[in-house]
Amino acid sequence: MILAKVTGHVVATQKCDELRGSNLLLITQLDDDQQPMKNRTWVAVDSVGAGMHDIVLAEEYLALNKDRYKAMSVVAIVENVFRDA
């Protein structure tokens, strides 16, 4: 799982059957200081109703259909992050 920030929305008029009815988000992975990382941006399926600038938890999974592919899914909206200094 990765900690990421929602940085945009993706509009797709044609989607595979598994993605129909799903919202797609642009997410950027955050580093340990919760700053966006360069070259770490993905499109993810929104499973929780996340919005722009939300901090989210995302996971990568293998979709098991006729064409196996990897996909990213937003699975939680993060309220707070606590860590030892």
Identify what each model region corresponds to:
Residues M1-T13:
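Structural detector for short beta-strands of small beta-barrel domains
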Residues V10, Q14, D31, V78-V81:
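A generic structural motif
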Residues E18-I27:
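Short aromatic-glycine-enriched beta-strand elements
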Residues D33-T41:
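Short, structured beta-strand/loop micro-motifs enriched in basic residues and often containing a Trp
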Residues I55-A85:
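C-terminal structural segments of small proteins and small subunits
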